[in-house]
């Protein structure tokens, strides 16, 4: 957060890895209160957190609700080998599904630098938690499986807002 008051020749820069909270904004506002009032005039953190919760809270709650209850009779996943492989997307590049510690792992980015464990939900539907800033927000990863019982595509929900989150299996 960068807050400047040129008329008073003062400003503050707050660097924080605190999203989605209002901590950086609260620090800046409290700083200006201290400079101009000599004391904090209100609980800025509570006010900013309420604002951030109103912006991001509904999305987190909706995602949690979508995945909080397993189907009454969930179908088991196929063998990991049905899903493991390289997948390509013209917009996002490559996604690699591999096996790690007995579970499936999604790797994205150059050289697979971002890894996300996939938890099973139902048959070919899995859950990941791709947002470091919002670790409690689940997101779906759904495989499209052909008659050969092998995935030919995977849709990554958090990349699919504009319908561009489906990756096709790359030829080996």
Spell out what each predicted region is.
Residues 1-172:
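Catalytic loop of the DD-peptidase/beta-lactamase superfamily, centered on the K-T-G motif
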């Amino acid at each position: 957060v960068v807050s400047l008051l040129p008329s008073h020749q003062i400003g503050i820069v707050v660097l924080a890895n605190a999203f989605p909270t209002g901590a950086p904004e609260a620090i800046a506002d409290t700083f200006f209160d201290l400079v101009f009032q000599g004391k904090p005039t209100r609980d800025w953190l509570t006010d900013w957190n309420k604002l951030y919760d109103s912006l991001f809270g509904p999305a987190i709650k909706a995602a949690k609700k979508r995945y909080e209850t397993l189907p009454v009779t969930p179908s088991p996943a196929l063998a990991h080998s049905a899903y493991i492989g390289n997948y390509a997307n013209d917009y996002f590049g490559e996604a690699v599904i591999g096996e790690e510690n007995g579970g499936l792992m999604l790797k994205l980015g150059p050289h697979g630098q971002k890894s996300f464990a996939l938890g099973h939900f139902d048959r070919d539907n899995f859950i990941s938690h791709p947002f470091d800033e919002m670790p409690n927000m689940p997101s779906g990863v759904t495989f499209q499986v052909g008659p050969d019982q092998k995935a030919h595509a995977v849709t990554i929900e958090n990349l699919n807002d504009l319908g561009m989150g489906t990756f096709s299996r790359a030829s080996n």
